[in-house]
């Protein structure tokens, strides 16, 4: 009989089957081990993926986060370049300004804090005395101009009250951490406010202040001590948090001067109009950077290893514009716009016909680039302009989908509550010489004449007949006043401004050739001037559409629309030998040290007509102006100079009618001088003048051109007609009762200068009531006649003492004081006819004896 242990395998199996817990425990150990391995693998994969994500996939982002936490990247502002006139006078510059701001929530000296015992809530109450003290001191400094002249501030003025209230309102926002007190503050005021706040905070520091030190601090602030109930000096604890942020301001020292040319910058210092915009990349420069370590508070740590990338300051613009010429142009243009109640602004250009350099360019009314958003000075004009051009400016109602609302007749409904602020600004910012089209009228006859002469279809002596009416197809053309000029040559036709002659000349040239010349003279493209917003919209008949009627109307300037600057470049080409040049305002670009970086040379685009044809055009234009005694162009004549010119009276582009039913007009005049070898062109245009006397440009625009020439020709040293008039005398005409503009013309023709004693623009249309020297007086050639429109007596002035001065300097002193001058002998002044210090009429001739 076998024992139970005689079969080991069976015994073992019996033991296993008999211990199920052991078997379960073993299985769990295997599962646990597998799970542990799996977890380790998953964890490892997670770590690997995280490392991949941090180091590789998103590494750049995390490195940037780390750098931002550790490094402080500060911008170094580049200094914007300045703009100068041709002689170096600053027209636009950049200055450092400061924004003064406060942190009312941290200005504990201005508030009393109480705590509710139940809710533990804190309540801050303004300390009226402290608030008044701080607001007063800050306001006085803001209005002082220099931070020091506090006593000069009128504390009763509206300006003071407004500024004081603004400061108080800002500091009263006790839960705010940022409140602006003032902007565009100069450095002197900023330093004064900082010193005041520093001293104030020292006096009110929580650490306490000794009585002696407190007395000194309060005395420095100009404040007395307060006393406690026991009579000891006390001061309220706390501080005022006022800081300054640096900024830059673009300054235009002459205000509205050349505003349409210079343009302006926005609040971020970027050029948005005019030269500021077209030369933005040149003027702006490139900002620099400083990269330093920062501490836990985000502040820079002083570190000699800081990395700095220097800013590259902007370059300067030196213009061809001359402030002296620009001043003359703007003065006379302003007078003309006011005197003739010009509804749609006026513009003027003075340009070198050979190089294209623009010496002056103006549009009036305009704006102040120091505050371009302000249109209040032009509001009346702007309102009238918007009302006069409803199809251009009216704002119409729209539904929620942006569709126009219409009335029962299908017409769009005007929005009576619309805001025209943006429209007003856009209008006043426009440079009229390059942004607006107009029919050039008879000024274009110069171009038609050039076409005819250059093509061989006409000469100076080509005679055509004007019977007073001329029909083309079904269209009948007349001359002004329906006058019949009879037989006339090219020069006579230009002087007579004969429409019929030039219609016939246009027919001789023919549509195809006329268009080719029109294109060659630059009327189908931009002039390329270095100013922004030159219109790209051209309104003219293509060669295929230039039919016989269109050709006839185009020949005398009443069918194709152009810009004033296009007219100037075309007329320049007609007289300078036939070369179409690109006009430009910038003469050169310099760096911050004045070194020339780039010069803007003459760009000849092409030769349009021959030199011989150009010579003929110069001759007929000079015939138009003559000696001032014949033809409307004579109103632009200035004695002593050879001047060529042409007037143009055209209908407005939109063919609007005035209240009297006639079409609104545009009056313009273009002159060149010296006529035999032109150097400059002077152009004036008045858009929709409302002169009760006339519409003719020869009466409205030509005198303005003549007045400009009378002052700038001597200044520029323009060659005279060669006649020596020194020592000659001129009889002063009787100008009493004459309109101011006509008085100017008469004096220009005689070689006398003029000065309007009362030069307010609203008086320029008035009659002359008094003149000195008086009518009939024999005076030296070039004498200035003082004209008055508001008095029957001349104004007196004190005669300066010019003895011992050179003759030239003495003349300057006397002219500046309002006197004429004659000189006998040479050397220094030995005696003068009017005693020094005596009071005599302005315009009096002071005779000097030199030796």
Predicted segment positions?
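Acidic/histidine-enriched alpha-helical segments
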Residues: 150-169, 342-355, 465-469, 532-535, ...
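Ligand-recognition elements built from short beta-strands and adjacent flexible loops
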Residues: 600, 640, 654, 684-851
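Extracytoplasmic
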Residues: 76-79, 86, 93-97, 176, ...
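Sec-exported extracytoplasmic/periplasmic mature domains
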Residues: 139-148, 198, 266, 284, ...
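Soluble non-cytosolic domains of exported or imported proteins
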Residues: 78, 125-132, 183-187, 269-273, ...
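Periplasmic/cell-envelope proteins involved in peptidoglycan metabolism and beta-lactam response
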Residues: 1-413, 437, 512-519, 638-639, ...
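Beta-lactam-recognizing serine transpeptidase/beta-lactamase-like catalytic domain environment
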Residues: 92, 98, 295-309, 354-443, ...
